[in-house]
Amino acid sequence: MINGINHVTWNVENVEEAFRFYVNVLGLKPIMKSRESAYFMAGSTWLAVVKGDRREDTGYDHTAFDLDRSDYDKTVEILRKREVVQWKKNESEGDSFYFLDPSGNRLELHCSSLESRIEYGKENWEGDVEWYI
């Protein structure tokens, strides 16, 4: 049984730049850093960045960070002041802010739960949607 995200690993062009972004901009707790990689804690999930080539197009590939609604507006304002690049506008339920890290990884701040997403989907999504719960 899957209990949640264990970790997420992304390729980055510059480990030091990524390290500064995740610690100084997002406030993640650093675990380790080397020339080739760095690890951070985001709540109970760990994130690894590894020096490597980036794909040109990742479609909707991204990682969402859970955020309390009471912190959403303040956090988005901070990110905008720090000139992060927004890559997508939110088109679904809940509050979400989609943005890029310095290496172009696609991220999201999301203020909703799986339960509310399921409820929204069951009420609004049509077509070939199969629900298993």
Question: Language-model features: where?
Answer:
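Short linear motifs in intrinsically disordered
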Residues: G27-M32, D66-S70, V85-N90
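N-terminal beta-strand motif that seeds the catalytic metal site of vicinal oxygen chelate
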Residues: M1-E16, T63, E119-I133
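Conserved short beta-strand elements that form part of the metal-binding/catalytic scaffold
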Residues: K29-D61, R69, R106-S112
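Amphipathic alpha-helical segments
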Residues: N14-K29, T75-L79
